[in-house]
Amino acid sequence: DRLRSRGLGDVYKRQLLNDKYNTIKDSEEVIAPVFGIAHVDDNIAYLGIVEEGEARASIECIPNGASVDYNRAYAKFILRKTYTQPTSNNSTAGSLHVYENERSHSNLAVRYVFLSDDNANYTGMAAAYREYLLRSEGLAQNESSFRTRVDFLGTERESFLLGTSSVVMTTVDDIYEIYDELESEGVSDLLTVYKGWQKKGLNSVPITSYKADSKIGGTSKLTKLIKDAGERNIRMYLYNDALRINPDEKNATFNVVKQINKRRFEETTYKTVYSTMNYLTPARTLSLLNSFIGKYVKSGVGNLALAGISNTLFSYTYSGDTYTRYDTQKMYENIVTEAAQKTKLVLEQPFAYLWSDTDAFLDMPLYTSSYIFEDESIPFLSIVLKGVMPMYSEYVNFEANKQEFFLKLVETGVYPSFYITKESSAKLLYTNSSDIYSSEYSTYKDTIVEYYKELKALHEKIADSTVTKHEIVDNDIRIVTYSNGVTVYINYGADAVSVDGVTIESMSYEVR
């Protein structure tokens, strides 16, 4: 629709009530419900924070000239939507466009923060949002020592005769060996998320109990690894996608969400072994996650990396009742809060309403959304959270320009992440992880060591300081100033540049 094409995207995520429109490019997910406009020449700006009703809102941005001669940014609240209702179970039959029976019921509130003088810019907006989160949203300032994130894939499955067979990528013994090698190179502070550790591998979801796949070494051996890692100052977390159920491996007849047109929601994976996934109802997620956590914690460990529910919201129907995004948000918030009380919890790219319950932000995005009317790429989220919460990047493995990506890590203060396997990624060719085209430890060992040493040295100068100023100079130069007085100069250009008496070589950085 015409207005939607100008929007930045829905606050939070998916609306299962509706069939998906075919568009050239989906709107971006909005991780934090904020927006703003700055008149830098006049030293005035505002920040808008959607405080209530954000689960069913979108952030709209319309540049001048599109319809009127003003730049506009605002929150649009959705009260009632239309959906496509098939007239029969026959896919070739007709359909009707039907309105939702009831409009959504929620308070709607936007807080505006007005900024002036030196604060009338995007850094001032980020600082204002940070202050709001610390003061009003229960976010605690818990930035800690630098760590490099090294994740492992345990097992996957590939098709074999009438079923599937195991593809073992990284065992418990392999991880011990990798930790020993990295420690001998001076890499001691690590955070690890172990994926595909459970019986029958990565896509055997949901996880209902604490049972490790025997091919990686079994439950007892995994438990010992987690405990031993902790004694070496390595934080090892087990990965759990609490949202999805694999209908090829688990009974998905009940407890899965349906769209309002009564059709079961199916997420297409575009992979060969398991082509679709379903979503669990939030009530079922609560039941299964509590069951897993109870058995996991009882074993004497409790580091958990939660995915799926951390960055997905939807409306759905179940057993004849309709549940809104507000219902899902409230349920997920309770689930995550309860999990955080029982475990040491980290969340995968969490929405803002869950930030107070996570010890770290996994998969922090570092690049722009690439909208045509964008002028500059601003690392807004990392400016907000730097010095408040440890942030870990998306995987270095899959970045085409690793030199530029490294400088992004320097600019944002985000810690590096690697997705590692002991075996060659060629073994994953016929699995659902076929998109992991480069992961072998021997390929990335030197890079892990290099990133660790250089970025740790930078962190020791910055410590737990927050960003007080972020400047863009002549497109290629970024200047980041921290609250402890340290300034970092980054040069993305092809030529050496001198700024403030500091010479920065091409594709390099300097710290003062």
PLM feature segments, named:
Residues 189-191, 235-237, 302-305, 344-346:
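Structural preference for beta-strand elements that scaffold enzyme active sites
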Residues 10-139:
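Extended acidic/polar, glycine-enriched regions
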Residues 18, 25-27, 31-73, 85-88, ...:
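Active-site-proximal substrate-binding groove within the catalytic cores of carbohydrate-active enzymes
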Residues 143-227, 232-287:
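Aromatic-lined carbohydrate-binding/catalytic grooves of carbohydrate-active enzymes
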Residues 7, 213-220, 387, 502, ...:
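Glycine-centered small-residue hotspots that permit tight backbone geometry or close packing
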Residues 7, 186-189, 299-300:
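Short loop/turn motifs at secondary-structure junctions
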Residues 1-12:
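Single conserved hydrophobic/aromatic residue that forms the stacking wall/gate
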Residues 113-151, 155-191, 434-457, 461-464, ...:
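Terminal accessory/anchoring regions of large secretory-pathway or extracellular enzymes
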